[in-house]
Curated annotation (Swiss-Prot):
PANTHER family in the record: MAINTENANCE OF TELOMERE CAPPING PROTEIN 6 (PTHR35518:SF2), MAINTENANCE OF TELOMOERE CAPPING (PTHR35518)
Protein name per its UniProtKB record: Maintenance of telomere capping protein 6
Endpoints of the signal sequence: 1-20
Pfam family, one: TIM-barrel_MTC6
Glycosylation site residues: 32, 60, 80, 89, 156, 171, 175, 202, 240, 259, 311, 362, 433
Compartment list: Membrane
Length: 526
């Protein structure tokens, strides 16, 4: 019995320990997890962390204002695959498409044509349903907080060469809802009805604040609350609300080809006016230099460069330059643990906080990891105004700049960070107008709680990807259970080795009792 009790105690202690270990799984363990690809270069751990942290910073931006980097699939994917398509090798095309999904591109333009009451990819024998199945597979494999992101699919529909009566009949018999439901599932699609519902619930915003008229939901709301991953839009005028209720009409998107008609803003008023335009796409040829400029001007580039399998890496570099608009080329530094250490000079070091570097000579900025214990000035934003900044002149460590005791930012300002290329552009304009020289500035981004998990919300913000148990809390939790287990173990060992005195003297007691019983007289005394 005692042995069973002891084994139960040991099992309980081990279970507690395993639970604690499981709950402290770090994001660093996930750095080597990437969606497998066979054509496109996979993202390095550093690039994965940079892309994820950027997505998290943009969590409170509306999905129509996000900087997307896209690919025109007809120009990029299908221009050199004609012979392969004629051979009926659709597997190769789907492999290329899947590898592109695993890149940093998150918008795709797809040309379709109607074919026997179905939709087919132009110049191929590939059906739209095949593309949707590949898309569904990718969404399933990335449907978690680490890898989930919004994908925009823009459709160019070619009408069949029929007279007007036949065209209307073909259009009405084409059931896009059935195609999407069967091959993708509507649970992943953010639909026009979802937008209507969000606006009715006052869950949408524009540049001025909440708006039930022309607002859109935030990235965080769509990804994490509604679990939506895909926005489908039409660039032509083939469908209508009845024939394609899952697809946004063409007038929702500002889509241009070649050169943009939108000016690149340099004032707060210009930035505000540009932000009132939803879904700003530019389909053109780009290189790794000018794509960054278009991104900083608030446009989402759709790359139409002709690409081949042997130079796909060059195209991947262009996408990367447009996708990562914040971090420096070798940032953020990927670490395996978060710890506080002392340097040879005796000062504390913790490289888990982010500095924004401003270079006055070419008016550029970039993000780099810095020592949280160094003293620097910090960046403040005025209430909920996206483009109104203030840099405090008083220096402080990262922990002191925004702490439980209060922020170094003045009233109505808060410690903050540029959340988009447009906001970063407005910050550059502020620095230029204020005549700042080269400067290093604390911004609200750190990985103090968990290595490689970059979060906003001050020095005490927690990582959303894991439940953190510190070493101190772990020891506090384990010591009582260990002491009790050891004490009970000692008792069990003592009772199993040593005999109780009464048990040892059992025979002696029996002999004494027998002797006493013999001395007693039998019968009734006279």
């Amino acid at each position: 019995m005692w042995i069973l009790i002891y084994l139960f105690i040991i099992w309980s202690s081990l279970r507690t320990w395993v639970t604690a270990v499981d709950s402290t799984t770090t994001v660093g363990d996930d750095l080597n997890e990437t969606v497998s690809t066979s054509v496109w270069p996979t993202m390095s751990p550093q690039m994965t962390v940079a892309f994820r942290s950027q997505r998290d910073v943009m969590g409170n931006l509306t999905i129509d204002q996000l900087p997307y980097v896209g690919l025109n699939l007809r120009r990029v994917l299908l221009n050199n695959e004609t012979s392969m398509v004629n051979e009926g090798n659709n597997t190769r095309l789907l492999t290329l498409f899947k590898s592109m999904l695993s890149s940093e591109a998150n918008a795709f333009v797809l040309d379709l044509e109607q074919y026997n009451n179905d939709l087919r990819v132009v110049d191929t024998t590939l059906l739209f349903s095949d593309v949707l199945i590949a898309l569904q597979s990718f969404i399933f494999s990335t449907q978690n907080n680490l890898y989930a992101n919004i994908i925009v699919l823009l459709l160019n529909i070619s009408a069949p060469e029929l007279d007007s009566t036949e065209y209307r009949h073909q259009n009405q018999t084409l059931n896009t809802t059935y195609i999407l439901d069967k091959n993708l599932g509507n649970s992943f699609i953010y639909k026009p009805t979802d937008l209507q519902s969000d606006r009715a619930k006052n869950n949408t915003w524009n540049i001025y604040g909440k708006s039930s008229i022309d607002g859109w939901p935030t990235l965080g709301s769509v990804l994490y609350e509604q679990k939506k991953r895909l926005v489908i839009g039409e660039l032509t005028d083939f469908f209508n609300e009845t024939t394609a209720p899952y697809i946004f009409p063409h007038d929702v998107f500002h889509y241009e080809q070649g050169n943009s008609t939108l000016d690149c803003p340099s004032t707060v008023e210009g930035l505000t006016d540009l932000s009132s335009i939803h879904w700003r796409f530019l389909d053109s040829l780009f290189n790794s230099v000018d794509i960054k400029e278009y991104i900083s001007c608030g446009l989402s580039p759709i790359i139409s460069n002709s690409a081949y399998v042997n130079n796909v890496t060059q195209l991947a570099d262009i996408i990367h330059e447009g996708s990562v608009w914040s971090w420096d080329s070798d940032q953020p530094s990927v670490t395996q643990s978060t710890s506080k250490s002392g340097s040879s000079s005796g000062t504390l070091e913790a490289y888990n906080c982010v500095l924004l570097y401003y270079f006055a000579n070419n008016e550029t900025v970039t993000w780099r990891v810095g020592n949280c214990y160094n003293s620097n000035i910090g960046l403040c934003r005025y209430e909920n105004m996206a483009f109104r900044w203030l840099v405090r002149s008083n220096k402080a460590t990262y922990f002191d700049f925004d702490s439980y005791q209060g922020s170094k930012c003045p009233d109505q300002y808060s410690f903050n960070i540029p959340r988009s290329p447009l906001e970063q552009r407005s910050f550059i304009a502020y620095m230029r107008n204020s005549s700042f020289s080269d400067t290093q500035i604390w911004i609200d981004l750190n990985s103090i709680s968990v290595s490689n998990c970059w979060v906003s919300g001050g020095p005490y913000a927690s990582c959303p990807y894991e439940k953190v148990i510190s070493r101190r809390n772990f020891v506090t939790m384990m010591v009582p259970a260990s002491v009790c287990s050891f004490a009970l173990l000692c008792i069990v060992v003592y009772l199993s080795v040593l005999r109780v005195p009464i048990y040892d003297n059992r025979k002696n007691w029996r002999r004494v009792i027998n002797k006493i019983s013999k001395s007693e007289l039998e019968g009734v005394p006279s």
